[in-house]
A protein has these predicted regions:
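Canonical leucine-rich repeat
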Residues: 11-14, 31-34, 51-54, 71-74, ...
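Leucine-rich repeat
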Residues: 14-19, 27, 34-39, 47, ...
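Intrinsic-disorder/low-complexity detector
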Residues: 4, 9, 13, 19-20, ...
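Leucine-rich repeat domain C-terminal region
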Residues: 82-85, 93-151
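Conserved hydrophobic beta-strand positions in leucine-rich repeat
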Residues: 1-3, 21-23, 41-43, 61-63, ...
């Protein structure tokens, strides 16, 4: 479903068979309940303040430039996350990937938020996982731990 650039403030109930949702550049403050088979969400450039529970099949979630202060639990299937330019103060635990091939790269972009705390498991993630935390007020203890991980 592609409903970009429509100035939508609400969405109707979504079809159960929906796998791809692109609602970039609207005026949404919330998303409806998400279908269980959904694999891709792009809801950048809206006014979202919260997200519903994420489906276990979700692989890509992009919600840049919204007003999110909290993220729900992230599904293990997630391969790409972009929550840049929101109001997040923390991140949920990053899913441990034990069922994907070693070639699968995981990319989480969390720039320009208010993140001061990160989940402990970020410090022990697989090298195929990239997490970008630029422009966040991370504590000096966390910055030191992260720099030791990349050294």
């Amino acid at each position: 479903l592609d409903a970009c650039d429509n100035r939508l403030s609400t969405l109707p109930e979504l079809p159960a068979s929906l796998k791809h949702l692109d609602v970039d550049n609207n005026q949404l403050t919330m998303l409806p309940e998400l279908p269980a088979l959904l694999e891709y969400i792009n809801a950048d450039n809206n006014q979202l303040t919260m997200l519903p529970e994420l489906p276990t099949s979700l692989e890509v979630l992009s919600v840049r430039n919204n007003q999110l202060t909290f993220l729900p639990e992230l599904p293990e299937s997630l391969e790409a996350l972009d929550v840049s330019t929101n109001l997040l103060e923390s991140l949920p635990a990053v899913p441990v990937r034990n069922h994907h091939s070693e070639e699968t790269e995981i990319f989480f972009r969390c720039r320009e938020n208010r993140i001061t705390h990160i989940p402990e498991n970020i410090l022990s993630l697989d090298p195929t996982c990239t997490i970008i935390l630029e422009d966040n007020p991370l504590s000096s203890r966390i910055r030191e731990s992260l720099s030791q991980q990349t050294a």
